[in-house]
C-alpha cells in the first residue's frame, strides 16, 4: 500500500492507505464543455494590507499586522513586512490597467480600517485623506467599467483597538466595527453595491488567537478563537442591520460575508464514523460562521463536542459561547449572499482526542486530515489541486443554507518553487479544473453569481512573507518601482472570461498553448534586458557606495594632512 501524508497540528506522519477511500470519482473525471449563465461576473481579488504599502503615510494609523511584523520579525519568513508591499497605494492607475488587461468585470479589494480611522474609533478621528484615496480608486474602477466588491475588514485591525480593548476578545469591537462599517456605507455606498463584512474570519481567529501565527499573536488555546469568532459574528450582523435599516432603500446594495472552507471527504464512505467526521469537519469550518448567520445559532455538533470536552476538562460552562434568544433572532438571515472561498480538499477520518490533552480547536474536532500523495501539489505545502472537491462544497453550501446566491470570493494557487518565472502552467491547470467544477455545480442547480480568482498580484502573504506568490502578475519586489509582469495564466484566464466558459476541446487547448508561448517570450525579453530590469537596484546600491567611498577618501586625506601638520 502507498503512503498518505497526514496533517495533525502541524506534524506530518506517515500511514498506509485504508478502506475504499482512495477512489477517483468517475462522475467528476470528465471535463464539461459549456458556458456560464449570462451576467456571470468574473474578477480577481486582493487585500489592503497585502498590497497597499504606505503603512504610516497620509494619516494612516498602525494595524495589528504593522505591530506584529515590526515586533516579531522571527515569526514572518525572512523578517518581511508589508510596509511598502506592492506600493499599490501609489500605483492605482497601473493596477487598474492590469485589471483592464485581464478584462475582469469586478475587482475585490479591502479597505484599511486604520487608514480610514487611525485609532479605530469613528468618534475620535476620521482620516479625510484615506477617504479620498478609496473614493478616487472606486471612481477609477467604475470609469473602467469594473465593479468594486469591497471587503470591510481583511485582518488588519487598528492596533489602538488591540491595545486598548484586547481586539476581538472584547465585545466592544462589535460597536466600533459597526460605526466603521456605517462610515463606509455613508461615504462609498452610493457607488459600491457589493459589500463583504469580513474575509475568512475562521483563519483570522484560529491563527490570531489560537496558534499565534498571525497578528495579534495570541495563544489562548481552546478559548480565544471561540470568543473572537462570537464577537465577529455579532459585528457582522450589526453591520448588516445598519445597512438594511439605513442605507439599503437609498443605495440598493448587497451585504454578505466571505467564508473560506476546504472540502472534507470521508476516508471510507462505508464507515459511519468517517462520514460523521467529515460532516463535523465542514461544520467546524464553514458552519461555525455560516450557521449563525443563516440559522441563528452554532451547529449542533459544535455545541455538543465542545460542551462535552469542556465538561470532561472540569469546566462548569462550555468554552463555546452561547447566543441569547434575542441574539439568535437578530443574527438569523443577516446575509444577502454567501461569499465562499475555497482552495483545496482533505480526506477526513475519525480520531478521538483525550480531553486531558487540554483544550484546543484541533482536539475539539476529533478528526484527522489526510491528503492523497497522487494529488498535484501546488506551491505551498498545504495546497493540493483537487477540483472535484470544489463542486461538492458548492452543492453542500446550497443544500445546507437554503439555496443562497453564492459568490466565489477567492480561489487560487501559489507559484511553485524553482519554476520558470512567468510560465505558471500548474496555475492554468488549477484554473481550468476548478472553474470547470464550478460550471458543473451551476449545472447541478447551485446559484453561483460570480467568481473571484486569488489574486491580482504577487503580494505579502502573512507569515510566509513574499515567498508564496498567488498573483497573475509577477512583482519585482527588489526593484524600487516594483514593476509588474504578466504570467501565462493572465492570457488563459482572459480567454475563459471572454468565452465565459469552455467552448470546445480544440479552442481550450489553443488557449493553453498561446499562454505558454506568450510567457516564453516574456522570459526571453527579461533575460536579454537584465540591465534595464535591475537599473533601480543598481542605483540603490552603487550611488550609496560611491558616496561612502568619497567620504572615506576625504577622511583619509584629512587624516594624512593633519598628521603632516602635526
Swiss-Prot record:
Q: Name one GO molecular function term.
A: hydrolase activity, hydrolyzing O-glycosyl compounds
Q: Which GO terms describe its cellular component?
A: brush border; endoplasmic reticulum; endoplasmic reticulum membrane
List glycan-bearing residues. Answer: 170, 244
Q: Which residues lie on this side of the membrane: Extracellular?
A: 21-540
Q: What happens when the gene is disrupted?
A: No visible phenotype. The lens of the eye appears normal in young animals. However, formation of the lens suture is abnormal with an X-shaped or double-Y shaped morphology instead of a tight Y-shaped pattern. Optics of the lens are distorted and cortical cataracts develop; the phenotype progressively worsens with age. Expression of CLIC5 in the lens epithelium is almost completely absent.
- Which stretches face the Cytoplasmic side? 562-566
User: Which UniProt keyword terms apply here?
Assistant: Endoplasmic reticulum, Glycoprotein, Membrane, Sensory transduction, Signal, Transmembrane, Transmembrane helix, Vision
Residues of the signal peptide: 1-20
Keyword Signal applies = yes
Q: Which domain of life is it from?
A: Eukaryota
Tissue specificity, per the record, is:
Strongly expressed in the lens of the eye, where it localizes to the equatorial epithelium and outer layers of newly extending fiber cells (at protein level). May also be expressed in kidney and skin. However, another study suggests that expression is specific to eye and is minimal in other tissues.
Which membrane topology describes this protein?
Answer: Single-pass membrane protein
Q: What is its main location?
A: endoplasmic reticulum
Q: Where are the transmembrane segments?
A: 541-561
UniProt-listed GO biological process terms: carbohydrate metabolic process; lens morphogenesis in camera-type eye; visual perception
Which InterPro entries does the entry mention? Glyco_hydro_1, Glyco_hydro_1_N_CS, Glycoside_hydrolase_SF
* Subunit details: May form dimers.
* PANTHER family (UniProt xref): GLYCOSYL HYDROLASE (PTHR10353), LACTASE-LIKE PROTEIN (PTHR10353:SF336)
Belongs to which family? Belongs to the glycosyl hydrolase 1 family. Klotho subfamily.
Q: What does this protein do?
A: Plays a role in formation of the lens suture in the eye, which is important for normal optical properties of the lens.
Q: What is this protein called?
A: Lactase-like protein
Source organism per entry reads: Mus musculus
Amino acid at each position: 500500500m502507498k503512503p498518505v501524508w497526514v496533517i495533525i497540528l502541524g506534524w506530518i506522519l506517515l500511514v498506509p492507505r485504508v478502506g475504499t477511500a482512495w477512489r477517483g470519482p468517475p462522475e467528476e473525471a470528465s471535463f464539461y464543455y459549456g458556458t456560464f449563465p449570462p451576467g456571470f461576473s468574473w474578477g480577481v481579488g486582493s487585500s489592503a494590507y497585502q498590497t497597499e504599502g504606505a503603512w504610516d503615510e497620509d494619516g494612516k494609523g498602525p494595524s495589528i499586522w504593522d505591530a506584529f511584523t515590526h515586533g516579531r520579525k522571527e515569526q514572518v519568513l525572512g523578517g518581511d513586512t508589508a510596509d511598502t508591499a506592492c506600493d499599490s497605494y501609489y500605483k492605482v492607475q497601473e493596477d487598474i490597467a492590469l485589471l483592464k488587461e485581464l478584462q475582469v468585470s469586478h475587482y475585490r479589494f479591502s479597505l484599511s480600517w486604520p487608514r480610514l480611522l487611525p485609532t479605530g474609533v469613528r468618534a475620535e478621528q476620521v482620516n479625510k485623506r484615506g477617504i479620498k484615496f478609496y473614493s478616487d480608486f472606486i471612481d477609477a474602477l467604475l470609469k473602467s467599467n469594473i465593479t468594486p466588491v469591497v471587503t470591510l475588514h481583511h485582518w488588519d485591525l487598528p492596533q489602538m483597538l488591540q491595545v486598548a480593548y484586547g481586539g476581538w476578545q472584547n465585545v466592544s469591537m462589535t460597536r466600533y466595527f459597526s460605526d466603521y462599517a456605517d462610515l463606509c456605507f455613508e461615504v462609498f455606498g452610493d457607488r459600491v453595491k457589493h459589500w463583504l463584512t469580513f474575509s475568512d474570519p475562521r483563519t483570522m481567529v484560529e491563527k490570531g488567537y489560537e496558534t499565534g501565527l498571525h497578528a495579534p499573536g495570541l495563544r489562548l488555546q481552546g478559548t480565544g478563537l471561540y470568543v473572537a469568532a462570537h464577537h465577529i459574528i455579532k459585528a457582522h450582523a450589526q453591520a448588516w442591520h445598519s445597512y438594511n435599516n439605513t442605507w439599503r432603500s437609498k443605495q440598493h446594495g448587497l451585504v454578505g460575508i466571505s467564508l473560506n472552507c476546504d472540502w472534507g471527504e470521508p476516508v471510507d464512505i462505508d464507515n459511519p464514523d468517517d462520514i460523521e467526521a467529515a460532516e463535523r469537519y465542514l461544520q467546524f469550518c464553514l458552519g461555525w460562521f455560516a450557521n449563525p448567520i443563516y440559522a441563528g445559532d452554532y451547529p449542533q455538533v459544535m455545541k455538543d463536542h465542545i460542551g462535552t470536552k469542556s465538561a470532561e476538562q472540569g469546566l462548569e460552562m462550555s468554552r463555546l459561547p452561547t447566543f441569547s434568544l434575542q441574539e439568535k433572532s437578530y443574527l438569523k438571515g443577516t446575509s444577502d449572499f454567501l461569499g465562499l472561498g475555497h482552495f483545496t480538499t482533505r480526506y477526513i477520518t475519525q480520531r478521538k482526542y483525550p480531553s486531558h490533552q487540554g483544550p484546543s480547536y484541533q482536539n475539539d474536532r476529533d478528526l484527522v486530515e489526510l491528503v492523497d500523495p497522487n494529488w498535484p501539489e501546488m506551491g505551498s505545502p498545504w495546497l493540493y489541486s483537487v477540483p472535484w472537491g470544489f463542486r461538492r462544497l458548492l452543492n453542500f453550501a446550497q443544500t445546507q443554507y437554503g439555496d443562497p446566491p453564492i459568490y466565489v470570493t477567492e480561489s487560487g494557487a501559489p507559484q511553485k518553487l524553482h519554476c520558470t518565472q512567468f510560465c505558471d502552467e500548474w496555475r492554468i491547470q488549477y484554473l481550468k479544473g476548478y472553474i470547470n467544477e464550478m460550471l458543473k455545480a451551476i449545472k447541478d442547480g447551485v446559484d453561483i453569481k460570480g467568481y473571484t480568482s486569488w489574486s491580482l498580484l504577487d503580494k505579502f502573504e502573512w507569515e510566509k512573507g513574499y515567498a508564496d506568490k498567488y498573483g497573475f502578475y509577477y512583482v519585482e519586489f527588489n526593484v524600487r518601482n516594483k514593476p509588474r509582469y504578466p504570467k501565462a495564466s493572465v492570457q488563459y484566464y482572459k480567454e475563459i472570461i471572454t468565452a465565459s466558459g469552455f467552448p470546445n476541446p480544440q479552442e481550450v487547448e489553443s488557449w493553453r498553448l498561446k499562454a505558454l508561448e506568450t510567457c516564453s517570450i516574456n522570459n526571453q525579453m527579461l533575460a536579454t534586458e537584465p540591465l534595464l530590469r535591475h537599473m533601480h537596484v543598481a542605483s540603490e546600491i552603487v550611488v550609496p557606495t560611491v558616496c561612502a567611498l568619497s567620504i572615506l577618501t576625504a577622511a583619509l586625506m584629512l587624516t594624512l594632512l593633519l598628521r603632516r601638520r602635526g
